[in-house]
């Protein structure tokens, strides 16, 4: 992989991992259309690490508060307000995707990586679901109103993100909106819920990478991938959280539909 490809894929990962438009779909479809070689596990680790760094940098205050709430909540659970229980709900919401990912991620990835038409269809189908969620429901709840039940439901929805074209942030935001949370709360909880999963994915892939080693020729592309995905991931988080305070998610809906339709045309007639 050359530095140009590493830069483009790093930018794509940074933007699409955070925005509700599916990073896996873009990272499969773009190299397919441009006839680039597969990036491989080494570069996947770099991209995940970059977006993980971006999320940690943006939410560092939240993470410190969550750590404090975790130990406080353990000491006196019954008398803690709901907001202090948030770290436990994030952990509970992480379990479904962690278990399903451990059991089926490789099978699902191999199945859908060879089916770009299905990926394009999922981009469209789950765009319509996001549109429905964005226009229905009360949307009155803030993140402090999260409960164990709602955290687990959103966590179960996150399992669908293993399918390329669904989008981790897209499906968790959709689930939260359908449960009555406002857009900002849905987006913020989606990002916080993604941190353990993104970290776990990076560590899991890194463990395999350490066994094989990193070829010297891959070092520069890896560093470029980490840097670009981190920078654009940070920008994307800031952009989305500001956007949801004043407008709907329909720009992402139309984008997903457009990309899905263009991909189907290219695949079938290109």
Swiss-Prot record:
InterPro entries: UppP (IPR003824). One of its GO terms (cellular component) is plasma membrane. It catalyses: di-trans,octa-cis-undecaprenyl diphosphate + H2O = di-trans,octa-cis-undecaprenyl phosphate + phosphate + H(+). It holds the Pfam family BacA. Keywords: Antibiotic resistance, Cell inner membrane, Cell membrane, Cell shape, Cell wall biogenesis/degradation, Hydrolase, Membrane, Peptidoglycan synthesis, Transmembrane, Transmembrane helix. Its EC number is 3.6.1.27. It is found in: Cell inner membrane. GO terms for biological process: cell wall organization; peptidoglycan biosynthetic process; regulation of cell shape; response to antibiotic. It is a multi-pass membrane protein. The chain crosses the membrane at residues 14-34, 40-60, 88-108, 117-137, 146-166, 189-209, 221-241, 249-269. It comes from the Bacteria. GO terms for molecular function: undecaprenyl-diphosphatase activity. It is an enzyme of class 3 (hydrolase). Bacitracin is thought to be involved in the inhibition of peptidoglycan synthesis by sequestering undecaprenyl diphosphate, thereby reducing the pool of lipid carrier available. HAMAP family: Undec_diphosphatase. Catalyzes the dephosphorylation of undecaprenyl diphosphate (UPP). Confers resistance to bacitracin. Belongs to the UppP family. This is Undecaprenyl-diphosphatase. The gene is uppP.
